[in-house]
Protein backbone atom coordinates (compact mmCIF):
# COMPACT_ATOMS: atom_id res chain seq x y z
CA UNK A 1 0.00 0.00 0.00
CA UNK A 2 2.68 2.52 0.97
CA UNK A 3 4.71 1.64 -2.13
CA UNK A 4 1.65 2.30 -4.29
CA UNK A 5 1.08 5.66 -2.62
CA UNK A 6 4.75 6.58 -3.13
CA UNK A 7 4.47 5.59 -6.80
CA UNK A 8 1.32 7.66 -7.33
CA UNK A 9 2.95 10.67 -5.70
CA UNK A 10 6.07 10.29 -7.85
CA UNK A 11 4.00 9.97 -11.03
CA UNK A 12 1.54 12.74 -10.07
CA UNK A 13 -1.42 10.37 -10.25
CA UNK A 14 -4.50 11.87 -8.58
CA UNK A 15 -6.01 9.90 -5.71
CA UNK A 16 -7.96 10.49 -2.52
CA UNK A 17 -7.58 8.75 0.83
CA UNK A 18 -10.45 9.97 2.96
CA UNK A 19 -11.72 6.69 4.37
CA UNK A 20 -14.88 4.65 4.01
CA UNK A 21 -17.64 3.48 6.30
CA UNK A 22 -19.03 -0.05 6.42
CA UNK A 23 -22.63 0.19 7.57
CA UNK A 24 -25.23 -2.06 9.19
CA UNK A 25 -28.17 -1.64 11.54
CA UNK A 26 -26.96 -4.63 13.56
CA UNK A 27 -24.55 -3.16 16.13
CA UNK A 28 -23.22 -6.63 17.00
CA UNK A 29 -22.10 -7.22 13.41
CA UNK A 30 -20.19 -3.95 13.43
CA UNK A 31 -18.62 -4.85 16.79
CA UNK A 32 -17.51 -8.20 15.40
CA UNK A 33 -15.98 -6.52 12.35
CA UNK A 34 -14.22 -4.00 14.59
CA UNK A 35 -12.77 -6.86 16.66
CA UNK A 36 -11.32 -8.39 13.50
CA UNK A 37 -9.73 -5.06 12.59
CA UNK A 38 -8.19 -4.84 16.07
CA UNK A 39 -6.86 -8.40 15.80
CA UNK A 40 -5.22 -7.42 12.49
CA UNK A 41 -3.72 -4.25 14.05
CA UNK A 42 -5.48 -1.97 11.58
CA UNK A 43 -4.74 1.49 12.93
CA UNK A 44 -7.47 4.10 13.11
CA UNK A 45 -10.35 1.72 12.43
CA UNK A 46 -13.21 2.33 14.84
CA UNK A 47 -16.90 1.62 15.36
CA UNK A 48 -19.22 4.60 14.90
CA UNK A 49 -22.56 5.44 16.43
CA UNK A 50 -25.39 7.20 14.62
CA UNK A 51 -24.26 10.77 15.35
CA UNK A 52 -20.67 9.98 14.30
CA UNK A 53 -21.91 8.50 11.02
CA UNK A 54 -23.86 11.68 10.30
CA UNK A 55 -20.71 13.75 10.84
CA UNK A 56 -19.05 11.87 7.98
CA UNK A 57 -22.06 11.12 5.79
CA UNK A 58 -25.04 13.37 6.62
CA UNK A 59 -27.35 11.41 4.31
CA UNK A 60 -26.52 7.98 5.72
CA UNK A 61 -29.29 6.74 8.04
CA UNK A 62 -27.74 3.59 9.52
CA UNK A 63 -27.48 2.98 13.27
CA UNK A 64 -23.87 1.76 13.29
CA UNK A 65 -20.82 1.67 11.07
CA UNK A 66 -17.13 0.87 10.97
CA UNK A 67 -14.81 3.66 9.85
CA UNK A 68 -11.75 2.62 7.83
CA UNK A 69 -9.47 5.66 7.37
CA UNK A 70 -6.96 3.86 5.11
CA UNK A 71 -9.47 3.43 2.27
CA UNK A 72 -9.10 5.56 -0.83
CA UNK A 73 -9.94 5.87 -4.50
CA UNK A 74 -7.87 6.13 -7.66
CA UNK A 75 -8.43 5.61 -11.38
CA UNK A 76 -6.61 2.30 -11.66
CA UNK A 77 -6.46 2.51 -15.45
CA UNK A 78 -4.21 5.54 -14.98
CA UNK A 79 -2.11 3.57 -12.46
CA UNK A 80 -1.61 0.58 -14.78
CA UNK A 81 -0.74 2.84 -17.70
CA UNK A 82 1.87 4.59 -15.54
CA UNK A 83 3.30 1.23 -14.40
CA UNK A 84 3.55 0.08 -18.03
CA UNK A 85 5.28 3.32 -19.00
CA UNK A 86 7.77 2.95 -16.14
CA UNK A 87 8.37 -0.69 -17.07
CA UNK A 88 9.21 0.30 -20.66
CA UNK A 89 11.48 3.13 -19.48
CA UNK A 90 13.48 0.54 -17.49
CA UNK A 91 14.01 -1.62 -20.56
CA UNK A 92 10.92 -3.81 -20.50
CA UNK A 93 8.63 -4.54 -23.43
CA UNK A 94 4.84 -4.58 -23.39
CA UNK A 95 3.21 -6.75 -26.05
CA UNK A 96 -0.44 -6.24 -26.91
CA UNK A 97 -3.13 -8.28 -28.66
CA UNK A 98 -1.50 -11.67 -28.22
CA UNK A 99 -3.09 -14.81 -26.83
CA UNK A 100 -0.86 -17.29 -24.98
CA UNK A 101 -1.33 -20.75 -26.43
CA UNK A 102 1.32 -22.77 -24.60
CA UNK A 103 3.77 -22.54 -21.68
CA UNK A 104 6.82 -24.81 -21.33
CA UNK A 105 9.88 -24.94 -19.08
CA UNK A 106 13.27 -25.14 -20.80
CA UNK A 107 16.65 -24.78 -19.03
CA UNK A 108 15.18 -22.97 -16.02
CA UNK A 109 13.29 -20.60 -18.30
CA UNK A 110 9.59 -20.23 -18.95
CA UNK A 111 8.83 -20.28 -22.67
CA UNK A 112 5.51 -18.74 -23.63
CA UNK A 113 4.14 -19.28 -27.12
CA UNK A 114 1.46 -16.91 -28.34
CA UNK A 115 -0.55 -16.87 -31.53
CA UNK A 116 2.17 -14.61 -32.99
CA UNK A 117 5.56 -15.43 -31.45
CA UNK A 118 7.43 -16.93 -28.47
CA UNK A 119 8.91 -15.33 -25.35
CA UNK A 120 11.24 -16.68 -22.69
CA UNK A 121 11.82 -15.46 -19.15
CA UNK A 122 13.31 -16.63 -15.89
CA UNK A 123 10.12 -15.66 -14.09
CA UNK A 124 6.45 -15.77 -15.01
CA UNK A 125 3.99 -13.64 -13.05
CA UNK A 126 0.41 -14.69 -13.67
CA UNK A 127 -1.79 -11.60 -13.45
CA UNK A 128 -4.21 -12.55 -16.21
CA UNK A 129 -7.35 -11.56 -14.35
CA UNK A 130 -10.33 -13.63 -15.39
CA UNK A 131 -7.97 -15.83 -17.40
CA UNK A 132 -5.54 -16.51 -14.54
CA UNK A 133 -6.91 -20.03 -14.07
CA UNK A 134 -6.44 -20.72 -17.79
CA UNK A 135 -2.84 -19.47 -17.70
CA UNK A 136 -2.12 -21.58 -14.60
CA UNK A 137 -3.36 -24.70 -16.39
CA UNK A 138 -1.19 -23.86 -19.42
CA UNK A 139 1.74 -23.78 -16.97
CA UNK A 140 0.83 -27.29 -15.75
CA UNK A 141 -0.48 -25.96 -12.45
CA UNK A 142 -3.83 -27.16 -11.18
CA UNK A 143 -5.31 -24.26 -9.19
CA UNK A 144 -8.14 -26.48 -7.89
CA UNK A 145 -10.61 -23.78 -8.80
CA UNK A 146 -12.23 -22.23 -11.84
CA UNK A 147 -13.15 -18.62 -12.40
CA UNK A 148 -16.83 -18.13 -13.22
CA UNK A 149 -17.25 -14.76 -14.93
CA UNK A 150 -19.76 -12.25 -13.58
CA UNK A 151 -20.35 -8.80 -14.98
CA UNK A 152 -20.91 -5.94 -12.57
CA UNK A 153 -23.09 -3.03 -13.63
CA UNK A 154 -23.05 0.41 -11.99
CA UNK A 155 -25.34 3.40 -11.95
CA UNK A 156 -23.77 6.86 -12.05
CA UNK A 157 -25.53 9.56 -10.06
CA UNK A 158 -26.17 12.88 -11.75
CA UNK A 159 -23.90 15.79 -10.87
CA UNK A 160 -26.83 17.41 -9.08
CA UNK A 161 -26.82 14.47 -6.62
CA UNK A 162 -23.05 14.21 -6.11
CA UNK A 163 -23.31 16.04 -2.78
CA UNK A 164 -25.24 13.13 -1.27
CA UNK A 165 -22.10 11.03 -0.71
CA UNK A 166 -18.78 12.33 0.63
CA UNK A 167 -16.56 9.28 0.21
CA UNK A 168 -17.39 5.55 0.26
CA UNK A 169 -20.30 3.71 1.88
CA UNK A 170 -20.22 -0.10 1.94
CA UNK A 171 -22.52 -2.74 3.43
CA UNK A 172 -21.20 -5.69 5.41
CA UNK A 173 -20.76 -8.37 2.78
CA UNK A 174 -22.46 -11.74 3.18
CA UNK A 175 -19.74 -14.36 3.89
CA UNK A 176 -21.88 -16.93 2.08
CA UNK A 177 -21.74 -14.95 -1.17
CA UNK A 178 -18.62 -13.97 -3.17
CA UNK A 179 -19.71 -10.36 -3.60
CA UNK A 180 -19.01 -7.06 -1.85
CA UNK A 181 -22.62 -5.92 -2.09
CA UNK A 182 -24.03 -2.70 -3.49
CA UNK A 183 -21.88 0.24 -2.41
CA UNK A 184 -21.53 3.96 -3.08
CA UNK A 185 -18.20 5.44 -4.14
CA UNK A 186 -17.13 9.00 -4.90
CA UNK A 187 -14.38 8.75 -7.52
CA UNK A 188 -11.39 11.04 -7.88
CA UNK A 189 -13.37 13.16 -10.35
CA UNK A 190 -16.22 13.60 -7.87
CA UNK A 191 -18.58 11.28 -9.73
CA UNK A 192 -20.72 8.95 -7.59
CA UNK A 193 -21.08 5.31 -8.62
CA UNK A 194 -23.70 2.97 -7.14
CA UNK A 195 -23.27 -0.77 -7.62
CA UNK A 196 -22.41 -3.29 -8.72
CA UNK A 197 -25.01 -5.90 -9.34
CA UNK A 198 -23.77 -9.33 -10.44
CA UNK A 199 -24.84 -10.72 -13.81
CA UNK A 200 -23.60 -14.13 -14.85
CA UNK A 201 -21.62 -13.72 -18.07
CA UNK A 202 -21.57 -16.47 -20.66
CA UNK A 203 -17.97 -15.68 -21.66
CA UNK A 204 -14.97 -14.19 -19.88
CA UNK A 205 -14.75 -11.54 -22.59
CA UNK A 206 -18.12 -10.17 -21.47
Question: What are the residue ranges of the model-derived segments?
Answer:
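Dinucleotide-binding Rossmann-like beta1-alpha1 core, especially the glycine-rich loop
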Residues: 1-56, 62, 181-182, 190-191, ...
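Alpha-helical scaffold segments in soluble metabolic enzymes
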Residues: 3, 35, 82, 134, ...
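A secondary-structure boundary/capping signal
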Residues: 19, 49, 69-70, 96, ...
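Short aromatic/hydrophobic contact patches that present stacked aromatics
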Residues: 20-22, 65-67, 154
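General beta-strand structural signal in soluble alpha/beta enzymes
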Residues: 46-49, 94-96, 126, 194
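Helical element adjacent to the flavin cofactor pocket in flavoenzyme catalytic cores
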Residues: 66-123, 127, 131-134
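Flavin-dependent oxidoreductases
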Residues: 103-206
Amino acid sequence: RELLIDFMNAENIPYRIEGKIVVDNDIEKIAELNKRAEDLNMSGVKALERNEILDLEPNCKFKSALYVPQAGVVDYKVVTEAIAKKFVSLGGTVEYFQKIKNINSQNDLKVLTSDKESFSSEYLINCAGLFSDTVAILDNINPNLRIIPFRGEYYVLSKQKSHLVNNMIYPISDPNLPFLGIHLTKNVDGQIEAGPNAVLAFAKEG
